[in-house]
């Protein structure tokens, strides 16, 4: 009985151990199904078997260095994002010297071209400035000559108009503004002279007839001798000098005839009128 029990316990323990081992292996194997196999040779370097990022053309990274191997250093994988260092070879140095020489030549050429352009621009500016000055001077000369000619013509015309029997001075400037020609100015001059002649010859036509009669009677009395005696010449001259005052009186009478008679009042030899009638 005891042996049978011992045998059962042994079987149970073995089955438990085997069950535990199988369960542990079942948990470990699914997680490592997709794992890649890594084969390590004797020298401790990785072999190029996978298509992962661990590919190298030369030596691989010594993940597991071998103590027996003579090389103990670790090769660092270079960064692909960084540019490789420039090696100062002979060919590279020659190319660099040529590039520097070419850059210096281009710089010198650019400077010469810039200087040439500046000189050309300065010449062009000077030429334009000189042309503008000559044009402005010629225009000023033309204006001066035209102004002088116009002034000469105006002075001549004004002198012609000033010379006349009427004694009136006519300004040619106003006639030129209103567009009057020489023919029109001559007509105006003839009209003014004829008008002045009519005024000089018949001043009594504009005054009242009683003044005309009085003037004629006065002239007859002056020419006839008084009482058979001759009148002194000085007296006749003095009486002739009084005629302009008579003409002034006639003109005054003509002016007063247009005033309202109710507004004026005569006191002896004076006429008094209201200011309201004149306004």
Curated annotation (Swiss-Prot):
Cellular component terms (Gene Ontology): nucleus
Assembly and oligomerization: Interacts with light-activated phyB. Binds directly to PIF1 and COP1.
PANTHER family: OS01G0687300 PROTEIN
Annotated keywords: Nucleus, Ubl conjugation
One GO biological process term: regulation of red or far-red light signaling pathway
Source domain of life: Eukaryota
Phenotype of null mutants: Reduced seed germination in red (R) light; this phenotype is reversed in plants lacking PIF1. Reduced PIF1 degradation in response to red light pulse. Hypersensitivity to gravity stimulus and increased greening. Increased hypocotyl growth independently of far-red (FR) pulse at light-off, as the result of a rapid loss of active phyB due to increased dark reversion. Highly unstable phyB-containing photobodies in plants lacking both PCH1 and PCHL.
Compartment(s) of residence: Nucleus
Protein name: Protein PHOTOPERIODIC CONTROL OF HYPOCOTYL 1-LIKE
Main localisation: nucleus
Annotated InterPro entries: PCH1 (IPR037476)
Protein role: Together with PCH1, regulates growth and development adaptation to the ambient environment by controlling negatively phytochrome B (phyB) dark reversion, a temperature-dependent thermal relaxation process during which phyB reverts from the active to the inactive state. Contributes to red (R) light-triggered photomorphogenesis. Promotes various light responses such as seed germination, hypocotyl gravitropism and chlorophyll biosynthesis, via direct interaction with PIF1 and COP1. Prevents DNA-binding ability of PIF1 to negatively regulate the expressions of its target genes.
Record field: transmembrane: none
């Amino acid at each position: 009985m005891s042996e049978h029990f011992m045998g059962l316990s042994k079987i149970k323990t073995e089955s438990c151990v085997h069950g535990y081992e199988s369960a542990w292996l079942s948990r470990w194997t699914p997680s490592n199904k997709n794992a890649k196999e890594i084969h390590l040779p004797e020298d401790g370097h990785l072999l190029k078997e996978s298509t992962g990022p661990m590919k190298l053309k030369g030596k691989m990274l010594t993940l597991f260095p071998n103590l027996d191997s003579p090389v103990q250093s670790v090769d660092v994988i270079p960064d692909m994002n960084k540019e490789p260092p420039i090696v100062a070879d002979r060919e590279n140095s020659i190319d660099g010297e040529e590039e520097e020489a070419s850059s210096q030549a281009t710089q010198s050429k650019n400077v010469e071209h810039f200087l040439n352009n500046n000189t050309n621009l300065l010449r062009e500016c000077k030429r334009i400035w000189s042309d503008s000055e000559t044009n402005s001077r010629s225009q000023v000369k033309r204006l001066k000559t035209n102004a002088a000619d116009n002034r000469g013509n105006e002075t001549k015309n004004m002198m012609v108009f000033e010379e006349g029997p009427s004694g009136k001075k006519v300004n040619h400037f106003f006639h030129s503004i209103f567009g009057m020609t020489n023919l029109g100015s001559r007509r105006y001059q003839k009209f003014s002279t004829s008008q002045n002649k009519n005024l000089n010859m018949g001043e009594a036509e504009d005054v009242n007839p009683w003044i005309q009669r009085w003037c004629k009677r006065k002239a007859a009395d002056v020419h006839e001798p008084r009482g058979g005696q001759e009148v002194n010449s000085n007296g006749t001259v003095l009486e002739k000098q009084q005629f302009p005052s008579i003409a002034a009186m006639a003109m005054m009478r003509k002016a007063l005839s247009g005033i309202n008679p109710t507004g004026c009042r005569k006191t002896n030899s004076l006429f008094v009128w209201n200011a309201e009638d004149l306004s």
